[in-house]
A protein has these predicted regions:
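N-terminal glycine-rich phosphate/pyrophosphate-binding loop and immediately adjacent elements
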Residues: 4-146, 443
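A conserved FAD-binding loop/helix module that cradles the flavin
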Residues: 59, 464-487
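Active-site/ligand-binding neighborhood in enzyme catalytic cores
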Residues: 129-247, 431-443
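A glycine-rich dinucleotide-binding beta-alpha-beta segment and adjacent secondary-structure elements
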Residues: 191-205, 350, 408-468
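A conserved beta-strand/loop element that lines the FAD pocket in flavoprotein oxidoreductases
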Residues: 244-257
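Mid-domain catalytic core of redox enzymes
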Residues: 256-364, 502-504
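Active-site-proximal substrate-binding core of FAD-dependent oxidoreductases
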Residues: 262, 487-517
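C-terminal segments that line or cap access tunnels to active or ligand-binding sites in enzymes
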Residues: 323-426
Length: 517
């Protein structure tokens, strides 16, 4: 397809952040065009079809649906009236290698769990919940932590002042911007192992690495309205696509952006498929490294910072078809299982099942499961480029290790497996266009680890590379922050629906995921 038009705003990438920005801007009346290289929206939070199953590609835990939460704010700004979902209870279950089982509840039962399993941890959880509320309150004000213009600096100062006046945080909270979360943990090795495992999936590091303020908020995700979404996590992206289209915007799939360049006061965007667009504003739902690859005229500072691959993690995935009759009724959909040894590399596994009630996710008699483990992406590229036989053997070894780890806590699992599709970091580069298959954003070691949102005037970066970092609710806030910034520069603001979206399931089976082609 070859055509030329001049939309005001172009969004590169239909990940959650890009779609959040596009939907909010469309709802406010601005013309938006989204370009996505794949056939499915959502990026790492997409769902894809394989052999009759709908698998969640990467991110499998949807949080932020509690009243006043990030996804409720997103729904209001996008004009979404309801989320087809059911809240998880418990939100997840963590299985430690010593046999300790820790259910994560969002209600008062969580305190019963803490008292029973980790009695010395109660002061920590009191601090954690209070601190998490403060940070989420701040994040929901959509501040820009890395201002590069007078306008964004002014917004940051105003948001911080309003936050201090409303929340009354202790001045000591400033210290938690730099000291690690481990400082607050009791001297209980089993509890510390549990916290490290939870932080790894929520903040990309362990308690000795993650700064305390962020760690407190990351540990709060199970309390923030975790839900089973009809059709899988990709439904969030699908509803955002529909919101953009409903307001007159457009979303083009199978359009991979090849280059961007300045054209006077506008941006010219070219895709591999021959589409050429011009826009006055550009939103890149990419990693900084992905942006550098399509921008030959990128500033020297950006090129310098992207010369080396990013620090962080890749993911090794298993997409598993399960015999539903072999799964015990009532099994929680989210499970984290640990084996002895260093976390990651198949010794810590996060498993998410399609809900029992959602018949759209798999053929009759089956259920879809996504399993993931943190892995060093460099390892997979080295093998793939030097020894393909060793690469395939390593895939088999990791597959066996992950299944063995999961079976430690879920003895029914081996007998339920009917098919397994493994995936390495190479797949995340191929399908999600994440250079090197780097996923999850930066390990949150300090508050300025992320990139600035405004790269140059008229070009904004959104996604897990900017504050507040990884997760579906965090990237949604990153997108909304850019949308609000653009609207305020035009003398407008986000348009909020008077009520939050409802959270309920439609009548009948789960709503099917749609593929956009």
């Amino acid at each position: 397809m070859t055509s030329q038009s001049t939309p005001r705003i172009v969004v590169i990438g239909a990940g959650i952040a890009g779609l959040a920005a596009g939907a909010a801007l469309s709802h406010a009346g601005l013309p938006v065009t989204v370009l996505e290289s794949h056939i499915y929206p959502g990026g790492c939070a997409a769902s894809f079809r394989y052999q009759g199953h709908w698998y969640d590609a990467g991110a499998t835990l949807v949080a932020g649906l509690a009243p006043g939460g990030p996804l409720q704010l997103l729904g209001r700004t996008a004009g979404i009236e309801s989320w087809p979902a059911r809240l998880c209870d418990p939100t997840m279950v963590v299985h430690l290698e010593d046999g300790t089982i820790v259910p994560r509840y969002a209600d008062e039962r969580r305190w019963e769990t803490y008292r029973s399993l980790f009695p010395t941890s109660l002061p920590f959880w009191t601090w954690q919940e209070k601190t998490a509320r403060l940070l989420w309150d701040f994040a929901l004000r959509l501040p820009e932590l890395r201002p590069r213009s007078l306008g964004s600096l002014r917004d940051l100062v105003a948001a911080t002042a309003r936050w201090f006046l409303a929340a009354h945080p202790s001045p000591a909270i400033v210290l938690d911007l730099w000291r690690p979360l481990a400082r607050y943990l009791p001297d209980d090795p089993i509890f510390r192992r549990f916290i490290d495992a939870q932080l790894l999936i929520a903040a990309q590091g362990v308690a000795t690495d993650i700064f305390a303020l962020y760690g407190a908020a990351a540990l709060d995700l199970p309390n923030a309205g975790v839900a089973e979404i009809a059709g899988g996590t990709g439904t969030i992206a699908r509803l955002l696509v529909e919101a953009i289209q409903r307001q007159g915007g457009s979303v083009h799939f199978r359009q991979e952006v090849e280059t961007i360049e300045r054209a006077g006061t506008s941006w010219r965007i070219r895709t591999r498929q021959g589409l050429v667009l011009e826009s006055s504003l550009l939103i890149a739902n990419l990693t900084p490294w992905g942006l550098a690859r399509i921008w030959p005229e990128a500033p020297k500072w950006l090129r310098s910072r992207t010369e080396r691959p990013p620090r962080g993690w890749g993911a090794f995935m298993l997409y598993v078809s399960l015999d539903s009759s072999a799964i015990p009724p009532g099994t929680p959909v989210h499970q984290q299982i640990l084996a002895p040894g260093q976390l990651g590399e198949g010794r810590s596994v996060f498993l998410s099942l399609s809900p029992e009630w959602d018949g759209s996710r798999a053929p009759a008699g089956r259920r879809a499961a996504t399993m993931s483990t943190h892995t060093r992406y460099e390892h997979w590229w080295r093998l793939a480029e030097t020894d393909r036989t060793a690469y395939e053997a390593e895939i088999a070894r990791y597959t066996e290790r992950m299944l063995d780890t999961a079976a430690r806590a879920l003895p029914w699992l081996p007998g339920a497996i009917r098919a397994v599709l493994p995936s390495t970091s190479l797949a995340f580069q191929r399908f999600a266009r994440r250079p090197w298959g780097w996923v999850g954003g930066f390990p949150q070691r300090h508050p300025f680890v992320g990139w600035p949102t405004e790269i140059v005037p008229g070009l904004y970066l959104v996604g897990d590379s900017v504050f507040p970092g990884q997760s579906i609710p965090a990237t949604a806030l990153a997108g909304l922050r850019v949308a609000r910034r653009i609207l305020r520069e035009l003398g407008a603001d986000l348009v909020l629906a008077p009520q939050e979206p409802s959270v309920h399931l439609p009548a009948g089976e789960g709503e099917p995921v749609m593929a956009y082609r």
